[in-house]
Curated annotation (Swiss-Prot):
Keywords: GTP-binding, Nucleotide-binding, Nucleus
Lineage of source species: Eukaryota, Metazoa, Chordata, Craniata, Vertebrata
Annotated organism of origin: Bos taurus (Bovine)
Chain intervals for the UniProt region annotation (Required for interaction with MAPK1): 1-18
Annotated gene: DNAJC27
Pfam families the UniProt entry points to: DnaJ, Ras
Family of this protein: Belongs to the small GTPase superfamily. Rab family.
UniProt-recorded name of the protein: DnaJ homolog subfamily C member 27
């Protein structure tokens, strides 16, 4: 009697997705896409005029994915062109240059632009965002460190990657994880899969770390008025210590923030009788 042959697993259905790139001009959006799709780096800067469009096919698990990529110009001049392309998007590559603080600070503005153009019925919770901290090869000029970028991304539930379009570092990992997350989204009824990144720390912890980073002096860091008493300083310190202690807080940058708070308390108490 012949042994029964094992059944061949049916390949998954093909999937078509739309991906857009967002970020200021000259942060490397086009170079990241070229590095992945064409395996090359273009050193000469050529500004994207309006929108560049490309199609690529990738294999994710057992599914063939046809990716429609819309590389959007970062110049404000092209806003009237960009605003037509935000709708029906499954994935966003959000890029900033680690050597340009203004490009990092502009990420919130880019999200606001997208939210506005999606309209009241648009839902950004059902889109996968991958944040690329690009040009990490330019270490001498870096002014946005990894913990600051990661904190911003993970506090919003976004994926975060350190990338270099020039060397290729982090590019393949980013796209593979990005596409996998989009497939999970599509298979999950259009709902963004839980990355567990935003659930690992609270908004209060993230906001406090940002505030400490930008504080102008030790008083400001502890959140007390100049001339505060020893008891007021200690009370403010204890509250921050409980919130940010590395044993209890896993938010990126929490350890440095905790050390800064300890140093601020020490400095203030030296001058308070």
């Amino acid at each position: 009697m012949e042994a029964s042959m094992p059944k061949r697993k049916e390949p998954g259905k093909s999937l078509r997705i739309k991906v857009i790139s967002m970020g200021n001009a000259e942060v490397g959006k086009s170079c990241i896409i070229k590095r992945y799709c064409e395996k090359r780096f273009v050193s000469k800067y050529l500004a994207t005029i309006g929108i560049d469009y490309g199609v690529t096919k990738v294999q994710v698990r057992d599914r063939e994915i046809k990716v429609n990529i819309f590389d959007m110009a970062g110049d404000p001049f092209f806003y009237e062109v960009r605003n037509e392309f935000y709708k029906d998007t499954q994935g966003v590559i959000l890029v900033y240059d680690v050597g340009q603080k203004d490009s990092f600070d502009a990420l919130d503005t880019w999200l606001a632009e997208m939210k506005q153009d999606l309209g009241p019925h648009g839902n950004m919770e059902n889109i996968v965002f991958a944040v690329c901290a690009n040009k990490i090869d330019c270490t001498k000029h870096r002014c946005v460190d990894e913990s600051e970028g990661r904190l911003w991304a993970e506090s919003k539930g976004f994926l975060y990657f350190e990338t270099s379009a020039q060397t290729g570092e982090g590019i393949n990992e980013m796209f593979q994880t990005f596409y996998l997350s989009i497939v999970d989204l599509c298979e999950n009824g259009g709902k963004r899969p839980n990355t567990n990144s935003s659930a690992s720390f609270t908004k209060e912890q993230a906001d406090t770390i940002r505030r400490i980073r930008s504080s102008k002096d030790s008083w400001d860091m502890l959140g007390v008025k100049p001339g505060a008493s020893r008891d007021e300083v200690n009370k403010a310190y204890r509250k921050l210590a409980v919130l940010l202690h590395p044993d209890k807080c896993v938010a990126p940058g929490s350890e440095d923030a905790f050390k800064a708070v300890v140093n601020a308390r020490t400095a203030l108490l030296k001058n308070i009788k």
